[in-house]
A protein has these predicted regions:
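Extended hydrophobic/aromatic segments used for targeting, binding, or gating
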Residues: 11, 230-282
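Acidic-and-aromatic substrate-binding clefts and catalytic sites of carbohydrate-active enzymes
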Residues: 87-91, 203-208, 234-243
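Membrane-embedded segments
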Residues: 58, 62-142
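Short hydrophobic beta-strand that contains or immediately precedes a catalytic carboxylate
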Residues: 55-59, 280
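Alpha-helical transmembrane signal-anchor/signal-peptide segments
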Residues: 26-46
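Secreted/periplasmic serine-hydrolase-like ester/acetyl group-modifying domain
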Residues: 112, 121-222
Length: 299
């Protein structure tokens, strides 16, 4: 009787699993044409740099829009790989994809966005869109908890992939061909008159904080120089969120993982941002890069 029940359950469950997998693994033509391809390109670059000391940038789009990696590479005389794509890939996947390619002596610049809820750790629908399209093998790096959190986005991912079928729209600054050889969002960009601002909370999700501690432990054990920095943030948004940002910085210090620079060091005038509080203009990215260089030279 027990075996019979198990067989019935398997017969009932397997079709559901098959449908879920089909929905999950569908590729998205928007993602195929977008800068999301940088997830795979960055992995391939790091793989080819095995045995070479390098600089790796891990962040959301504040990293993609916020560095001139050529300046960084020329100044430090090291190859630079900017892995940054989208904050909603989630910090866990941003790190797990690449961590086995890091080697002793590498410099890893880690500057995640301020949003610090569970979604900052596990990501959202963009994670499924980008991974399914460009690097399905990365799903093997997801933990049980990560899957439990992400399954709610499968239906949304599937519907958007269907909607984007055959897309030929020019994605402009977000297009795959807007990425340079380092992984930077390199298309020239100037300040837009209206910036998207963000509301923040001043405390970090406990599970997210624990993963940040894990990153620090991993770097120490592997002999990696981890440079943990606050993201760049526009001046007007910083003024409205200053108390929350300072509270978050204090929490990081209390957890034993302090920022290596105060948040205000990477706050710039609104005119140096492109379209959001995190996306620097071309000139803004150069200024931010030079500020980071000052920190790297002190290592």
């Amino acid at each position: 009787m027990r075996r019979f029940i198990i067989k019935i359950l398997l017969i009932a469950v397997l079709p559901v699993v098959a449908v879920m997998l089909r929905m999950l693994l569908i590729t998205d033509d928007y993602s195929r044409r977008s800068h999301g391809v940088n997830v795979r390109l960055a992995y391939n670059k790091l793989d080819k740099l095995s045995g070479t000391q390098k600089i790796v940038i891990i962040a959301g789009s504040n990293g993609g829009f916020g560095f001139n990696s050529k300046i960084l590479s020329d100044s430090m005389r090291m190859p630079v790989v900017n892995t940054s794509v989208h904050a909603s890939i989630g910090v866990r996947m941003q790190f797990e994809i690449y961590k086995d390619l890091f080697e002793r002596g590498d410099i890893v610049i880690f500057c995640p966005e301020y949003y610090n809820g569970k979604g900052r750790l596990y990501g959202g629908e963009p994670l499924l869109r980008i991974v399914s399209t460009h690097m399905p093998s990365a799903y093997l790096k997801m933990s049980v908890k990560h899957w439990q959190y992400s399954l709610k986005y499968v239906w949304q991912h599937y519907l958007e992939a269907i909607e984007h079928r055959g897309m030929t729209k020019d994605l402009g600054i977000f297009a795959a061909n807007a990425i340079n050889e380092y992984g930077d969002m390199a298309m020239p960009r100037e300040h837009k008159p209206t910036l998207i601002h963000y509301g923040l909370i001043g405390s970090m999700d406990e599970e997210t904080a624990e993963y940040y501690r894990y990153i620090h432990r991993f770097a120490k054990e592997k002999g990696i120089k981890l440079v943990y920095l606050p993201p760049t943030f526009c001046e007007s948004n910083y003024r409205t969120q200053k108390a929350n940002i300072q509270m978050l910085a204090k929490q990081m210090s209390a957890l034993g993982i302090p920022y290596m620079a105060p948040p205000e060091r990477f706050v710039y005038a609104d005119s140096l941002y492109y379209d959001t509080s995190y996306h620097l203009t071309t000139h803004g990215a150069e200024l931010r890069t030079k500020a980071v260089l000052e920190i790297l030279r002190e290592l």
